[in-house]
Amino acid sequence: TSKIKLLKAAQGLFAAKGFRDVSVREIAAAARVNSALVGYYFGGKQALFNEVYRAQAMPLAGERMRQLEAVTRNRHKPSVEEILKAWLLPWLRLGSEQGESALHLRMTANISRERWMHARAALPAADRTHAAFVKALRRCLPHLTREEVIWRLHFLTGAFTFGVRVPGALTALSR
């Protein structure tokens, strides 16, 4: 259907260019449909983005929570390393996959260079997941404030998305 064509085209374009640098006309042209259908099906570019992002972010958030629950269930107090593996491994698996999962990873990396404000509406599941990881890390790192844990997780995520967005950059910078 036209709606599915728009979703697939938007996902590819958002992955390649981010949110700001993609127009509704460009999405419609890639989908080979009338641009008015973006408004008809989604209400606009922002809502289309939200649907595309949510469709991929929800499974990632769910897998992260499953990983965290497995770590906390098997051990009373998991290590920081185990918690961070639960945070990163689902994302790393996305990077090794082809198709929609890899597109989501690239889309996340590209929008990380933009302001995240347009993505906020699509992130309630990610917010809950982030909060659960912060809570788990705080139990392991009681000497750190909540803000310090949050910023450290942000920096970890930022370093990872930079590595995805600019392949080979971290290796080059390490020389």
List where the protein language model places each region.
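Helix-turn-helix
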Residues: K5, L13-A47, E51-A55
